[in-house]
Regions:
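Helix-to-beta-strand junctions that scaffold the AdoMet/dcAdoMet cofactor pocket
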Residues: 44, 120-121, 135-137
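Acceptor-substrate binding/catalytic loop of class I
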Residues: 153-170
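Class I SAM-dependent methyltransferase SAM/SAH-binding core
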Residues: 50, 56-100
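A short glycine-rich, Lys/Arg-flanked "PGG" loop and its adjoining helix->strand segment in the class I
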Residues: 125-137
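Conserved class I S-adenosyl-L-methionine
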Residues: 2-44
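A conserved beta-strand element that flanks and buttresses the S-adenosyl-L-methionine
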Residues: 111-112
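Conserved beta-strand signature within the Rossmann-like core of class I S-adenosyl-L-methionine
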Residues: 138-145
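Core SAM-dependent methyltransferase catalytic element
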Residues: 187-203
């Protein structure tokens, strides 16, 4: 049996393999809307947003664009990026790993929804420096995690799908270390399909 570390390395290939099927499965229902509205309430109108793990751009990026914002989306899957480019050709789409992507600009908001939690714990810790690098004062940051420290396996069309989380206390320490204040955090949000969501703002 493959160990979890090896499975974590398969995430990029799994999403490439199942990009179109995942898009159909995800659908257009925006169960995240309440969180996205709170996220957007923290930033100016017509802001530039960074979406890490953007997928095909639907439905989340679509909603952000509809609210008048400009988007740069990053995804490791070339298929996902091609779909996003086709869906929203006026936005900027970058095929890259969120852990190593290099962008010479900063953003009013950073989103890592259903993407950050596929990273192994050490990579998650290192991402907070990346979040800070792309931030300015008052940048909003929102990401999803697990409700507690640990690793878990899901399933995507028969392939094992790796997830990991740090503890809530460690996330709070890292956010504070990199200059973010927690605005709201809900574990296993029943109004958002059980997601554990963090919303913070750069000071």
């Amino acid at each position: 049996m493959e160990n979890q570390s090896a499975l974590a390395q398969n995430i990029i290939e799994i999403y490439k393999k199942h990009a179109r099927a995942w898009t159909e499965l995800r659908g257009d229902f925006l169960y995240e809307k309440e969180w996205l509205d709170l996220f957007l309430s923290l930033i100016p109108v017509h802001s530039t947003l960074l979406d890490l793990g953007c997928g095909p751009g639907k439905p989340i990026a679509d909603y952000l664009i509809q609210q008048g914002h400009t988007l740069i989306g990053v995804d490791s899957s070339d298929v996902m990026i091609a779909m996003a480019q086709k869906n929203f050709p006026k936005q900027t789409w970058v095929q890259a790993d969120m852990r190593t992507v290099e962008l010479d600009q900063k953003f009013n908001a950073i989103l890592a929804w259903d993407s950050f939690f596929h990273l192994i714990p050490d990579d998650q810790r290192q991402m907070f420096a990346q979040f800070a690098q792309f931030s300015v004062t008052n940048t909003a940051l929102m990401f999803t995690s697990g409700p507690m420290a640990g690793e878990a396996m899901g399933d995507l069309f028969g392939d094992a799908l790796y997830h990991a989380s740090l503890s809530q206390d460690e996330y709070r320490v890292l956010l504070k270390q990199y200059g973010f204040n927690v605005v709201k955090m809900v574990a296993n949000d029943v109004e958002c399909t059980g997601h554990t969501v963090w919303l913070a703002q750069k000071q």
